[in-house]
Amino acid sequence: MIKQLDKKALRQKRHLRVRKNVRGTSEKPRLTVFKSQKHIYAQIIDDTKGVTLASASTTQKQLKEKLEKTWDENAAKEVGKLIAEKAKEKGITEIVFDRSGYKYHGKVKALAEAARETGLKF
């Protein structure tokens, strides 16, 4: 049986492997996702400058009030919509998606599809 610590270590290894190839630029920044037990976080990062251009999470007051639960797929969809809206405000239309070693399934997939529906291309 795989312990929780082992699962986390395996995810981090996958993330490092992916990060070797996935880079965000100022023209096409990187959208990265992080999941904790209770919240979902998304950031748009320009790796050449090392700057976070936009961020959204279920810890933000505007989402917390709207959501019943902050850790389910509906919450992930709302975070995806919010991060896409913030990106549009900054003039970002194309991104590189970094799933941070998570499977493209469930919350990560919901966040990505909501961002696509709101207008981000990746």
Curated annotation (Swiss-Prot):
Keywords: Ribonucleoprotein, Ribosomal protein, RNA-binding, rRNA-binding. GO terms for cellular component: cytosolic large ribosomal subunit. One of its GO terms (biological process) is translation. CDD domains: Ribosomal_L18_L5e. Pfam families: Ribosomal_L18p. The keyword DNA-binding does not apply. Belongs to the universal ribosomal protein uL18 family. PANTHER family: 39S RIBOSOMAL PROTEIN L18, MITOCHONDRIAL (PTHR12899), LARGE RIBOSOMAL SUBUNIT PROTEIN UL18M (PTHR12899:SF3). This is one of the proteins that bind and probably mediate the attachment of the 5S RNA into the large ribosomal subunit, where it forms part of the central protuberance. Part of the 50S ribosomal subunit; part of the 5S rRNA/L5/L18/L25 subcomplex. Contacts the 5S and 23S rRNAs. This is Large ribosomal subunit protein uL18. It comes from Petrotoga mobilis (strain DSM 10674 / SJ95). The lineage of its organism: Bacteria, Thermotogati, Thermotogota, Thermotogae, Petrotogales. The gene is rplR.
